[in-house]
Amino acid sequence: MRILVLGGTQFLSRAVAADAVRRGHEVVCASRGHSGGVPPGATLVRWDRDEDAPAALTGGGAYDAVVDVARQPSHVRRALAVLADAHWVFVSTISVYADDADPAGPGAGRLREAIPDDVDLAEDPGAYGGLKVACERLVLDAADSAVVVRPGLIVGPGDPSGRFAYWGRRAGDTGELVGPGDPSSLVQVIDVRDLATWIVTLAERRTTGTLDAVGPALPFADLVREIAPDATVTWLPDAFLEAEGIAPWTGPDSIPVWLPRPAYDGMLAHDAQPALDAGLVVRGIAETARDTRDWLGSDPAARIGGITREREADLLAHWRNRTT
């Protein structure tokens, strides 16, 4: 197949391009080229998507499939104007769902209101879900055939967000760790490599429809046990963490993956079975954590989110002082 990856230089889109090359496809990546190189074996066509598509994008012939991770509607419109006859795999997000307490998926979960015009996400990060809703609709309306995948939390080596790196750094730890909130709270992640492989499979099979791209949900305690089976985990209640100034999900004073409950009961508890039935294969959490730890050790520039180990030790000390 001849596959066009819109992007191809960072995290997920780069993993998609690399997997497609490994599987023997002809891969073209369209990107400004400012965020890194394309994988070996792929061809780069430079395209700033704030402008119309360059002639070089389509000059080499038709594409069998297009993979797009865009978040701005104008970028999707420009691509569809010249590429609508290919099979599209559009990578959206579970952030399109309006109710984070509800795990309902495609066809059942209520969507956010579409935002059809571009928004600077640095100024308004809350617009992300609505922008993706608009992008989904553009693709489904204009492409000859298409599948929309809605990933949850994408993790693994190369993650620029630093969220799962917090836990990957703890892979194999044997000391005491903070477990945030309720250990029975459901969480789910998907390894970027598994997602990329599945996206290429969807392109090969010309799968259509809309699917949540998530791994199986599991209790938070099980996730931590997979990451650090020999560690002692002390679970600290939400109220205590909030009183200590610890934020959920992301940021320097956060514990990543932890979310307020019940407001976010559904966000990391979507049904993985439809994706598994459609060919998604997921590796174990322990493998993802180990590989993330190894990547952190090999890349000094890798981002690690969340509180420091020193802050974690302070939390444990404060907790013991409160309960003794």
Feature locations, PLM:
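Glycine-rich Rossmann NAD(P)(H)-binding loop
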Residues: 6-7, 156, 180-185, 211-218, ...
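NAD(P)H-binding glycine-rich loop region in Rossmannoid oxidoreductase-like domains
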Residues: 9, 34-86, 90, 96-99
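Conserved glycine-rich Rossmann-like NAD(P)H-binding loop of the short-chain dehydrogenase/reductase
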Residues: 26-32
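Conserved Rossmann-fold NAD(P)-dependent oxidoreductase catalytic core, especially the SDR/UDP-sugar
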Residues: 78-133, 147
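Conserved beta-loop-beta element that borders a ligand/cofactor-binding pocket
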Residues: 92, 135-158
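Alpha-helical substrate-binding/gating segment
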Residues: 168-178, 185-225
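Mid/C-terminal beta-alpha module of Rossmann-like enzyme folds, strongest
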Residues: 201-266, 271, 290-291, 300-324
